[in-house]
């Protein structure tokens, strides 16, 4: 079964779910970011579903890692644009655009395509963070490219971009219990212990993203792959 809106959520069950302003200050050195940012920036997206009912679900781990980055570097991800929420800022001297698609998981690629086209950035400067049921809770796996692996959000991004050669940080949310429904699992919330475990790794996931920008995927893989 696919992993994306929940992995492989039938459209008959849950349609679409797989289911700032200008002077944002960078955390390091509080560098103002002008309205017209130069090219040479990174677009960092976290995947999830919009709406309070999905806020703390396993499938929204990508959103939560973006929130971690935004909080650490004082970036407001609140501008409604390109079918998503975006925030412009600086992370360790590197200009970035943080993105939380608001299309629901299965259509995440529509938002990503618009953002990349608007900023005219190369795919090499795109990083995506998302949930992975094949990894234990809190475990990370950095990859420079690869298939969707059953994740419908990534599947749509690959379809929209026409390539799977973009960096990603997979965040483990644990596999479903035997005999349970996969959709219910990814659209469900962690138990208390797993929630605390996941939260304790948000900062590490954010660090993996910055490592990809500063040192490349190979270095990030060596440092953060669990």
Regions inferred by a protein language model and the residue ranges of each:
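Nucleotide and nucleotide-moiety/phosphate-recognizing core
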Residues: 21-26, 30, 36-144, 155, ...
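Short glycine/threonine-rich catalytic loop with a Thr-x-Gly-x-Asp
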Residues: 147
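Intrinsic disorder/low-complexity segments
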Residues: 1-37
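Hydrophobic alpha-helical segments within soluble ligand-binding/sensing domains
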Residues: 150-153
């Amino acid at each position: 079964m696919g992993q994306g809106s929940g992995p492989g959520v039938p459209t008959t069950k849950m349609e679409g779910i797989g289911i700032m302003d200008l002077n944002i200050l960078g955390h390091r050195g509080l560098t103002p970011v002008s309205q017209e940012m130069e090219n040479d920036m990174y677009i960092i997206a976290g995947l999830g579903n919009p709406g309070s009912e999905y806020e703390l679900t396993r499938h929204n781990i990508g959103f939560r890692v973006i929130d971690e980055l935004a909080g650490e570097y004082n970036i407001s991800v609140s501008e409604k644009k390109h079918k998503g929420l975006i925030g412009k800022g600086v992370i360790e001297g590197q200009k970035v655009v943080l993105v939380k698609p608001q299309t629901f998981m299965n259509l995440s690629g529509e938002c990503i395509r618009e953002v990349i086209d608007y900023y005219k950035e190369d795919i090499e400067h795109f990083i995506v963070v998302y949930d992975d049921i094949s990894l234990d809770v809190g475990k990370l796996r950095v990859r420079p490219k690869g298939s969707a692996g059953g994740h419908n959000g990534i599947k749509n991004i690959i379809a929209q971009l026409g390539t799977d050669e973009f960096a990603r940080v997979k965040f483990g949310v644990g596999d479903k219990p035997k005999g349970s429904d996969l959709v219910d699992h990814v659209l469900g919330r962690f138990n208390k212990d797993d929630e605390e475990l996941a939260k304790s790794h948000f900062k590490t996931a954010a660090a993996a993203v910055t490592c990809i920008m500063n040192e490349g995927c190979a270095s990030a893989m060596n440092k953060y792959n669990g």
